[in-house]
Amino acid sequence: MTNIRKSHPLIKIVNDAFIDLPAPSNISSWWNFGSLLGVCLTVQILTGLFLAMHYTSDTATAFNSVTHICRDVNYGWLLRYLHANGASMFFICLYLHVGRGLYYGSYTYTETWNVGVILLFAVMATAFMGYVLPWGQMSFWGATVITNLLSAIPYIGTDLVEWIWGGFSVDKATLT
């Protein structure tokens, strides 16, 4: 008589993915962070979509829309806090994932490592946009401080910063 976990078509999929996974015996918990990145990214996308359904980018009503999300939307406060803290968890997992790669010498696989570096820069640019877009003084501060780093580029730095800002300083809502 065969074992049900190896003969049943649906249970066999779960068995092959979780129980009889062909993984080396010396694998450590450091290898979980890639999967945790996927979980965090999924949570970020889903909570971001649900928050975007109620968010208003107009400067006069943006704060009221956040208040509406927290008070009137069912579990809106939970969505907001999951989205905010999920971003922090995402970057913690990301840095631990990169640290694991450095520790185990994954940089010797240059093609794979270069793709990872490009993905890291893309994630940082996306996080910057997500940080700067909402209305508020903190996003103004973030936009000013982070983009001012470009002013260190010789000759074109100041012009580049003014081009990104659209003027001499960050002003109005950055989302519209």
From Swiss-Prot:
Binds 2 heme b groups non-covalently. The chain crosses the membrane at residues 33-53, 77-98, 113-133. One of its GO terms (molecular function) is metal ion binding. Pfam families: Cytochrome_B. Signal peptide: none annotated. GO terms for cellular component: mitochondrial inner membrane. GO terms for biological process: mitochondrial electron transport, ubiquinol to cytochrome c. The keyword Transmembrane applies. Belongs to the cytochrome b family. This is Cytochrome b. The lineage of its organism: Eukaryota, Metazoa, Chordata, Craniata, Vertebrata.
